[in-house]
Amino acid sequence: MDITHASDQKINSENFAKLALDCVHKEYPNKISHTMQSDKDVMPPRELTPAFYGCYDWHSSVHGHWLLTRLAKLYPDSELAPKAIAALEISLSEENLQQESVYVSGKGRKAFERPYGIAWLLQLAAELDDWDEPLAKEWRENIRPLEEILFSRVVEWLPKLTYPVRSGQHAQTAFALGLMLDWARTANNREVESLIRNRILEFYSDDKKCPIHYEPSGADFLSPCLAEADLMRRVMSPSEFAVWLNDFLDVPNSNTTWLEPAIVSDRSDPKLAHIDGLNLSRAWMLEGIASGLPPKDLRIKALSAAAAEHQESGLIGVNSEFYEGGHWLGSFAIYLVTKRGVLIQKIK
């Protein structure tokens, strides 16, 4: 199936939405990242974080809500839209989000879900920003206090981050900064945008010869090399980015197979299933890199061909057979097929 075709994409998107609808209010199984100070802090997930307690963990719940928001906004006449809106109405109440703010402000939680979960929360806020659904305006205001707490932590943390984290999992700096930068631009927060942009250039502008042949590690769901390149195209003009990429990544000037999709050996294993997410994120990062180059750059063909291969491989694993992947892969699929990262306007 060619998911780039509009009708096929809508069908696939509805299937992915079902994965999120099935888990945003499913409390168990659950893996909480919970710092406790005493016995009184022992509570079930629905009481600790009543907006984002489903989908196995907090960050997956957040981007599950992002998925529902994005699809209901893109396909308002679809069968999934009213179901998505109903789920969002339950989760994004003022009371629930007030408790989320109380929770993240608790003692010992200064680094809660930093940077990955924070980045997705900011994406959810950005997705609500320009939605003409009447309830969305209410939800946008409900989530604003939590948003302000979390982006203020980014503002405090980034200047202290001496070195970027170059892993292929949640702690990776490059991927999170890309989502955060996109949020800052959508929110028209010039101060935070400038901070993030400057740190990106300080961290990565001198990097050369990224060893992509060392990738992936066994539980990666993000590519360190591709995430960095996809980030840099957001802060450089096409001509600047083309020169930087020359030194950073060896991409052929022809439509040849140069980066093969990673192999998933066991989708019932929560860590090994990360590889499906890697293929999906590689696909959107390759597309993003191609979009940042001058239109006649000869590397675009190879980047686009590799993106298509990774998309095809990654989408195979996006289903409800195993909750290990089903609770989160739908969000990655939607980020890819709806071109979310590519569509954000970048500074030229």
What are these regions (language model features)?
Residues V62, L71-A184:
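Extended ligand-binding groove/face enriched in aromatic
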Residues Q9-L19, S78-E95, P134-W157, N189-D207, ...:
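Extended, well-ordered alpha-helical scaffold segments
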Residues R153-E228:
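Loop-centered beta-sheet repeat module
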Residues V243-P270:
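Flexible internal linker/loop segments at domain or repeat junctions
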Residues D2-Y53:
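Low-complexity, Ser/Thr/Pro/Gly-enriched N-terminal "stalk/linker" regions
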Residues D2-A6, H65-S78, A119-L135, A176-N188, ...:
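Well-ordered alpha-helical scaffold segments within catalytic/enzyme domains
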Residues I263-K348:
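Fungal-biased detection of long, low-complexity, Ser/Thr-
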Residues H5-Q9, R46-V62, V102-I118, K160-T173, ...:
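Solvent-exposed loop and edge beta-strand segments that line ligand/cofactor-binding
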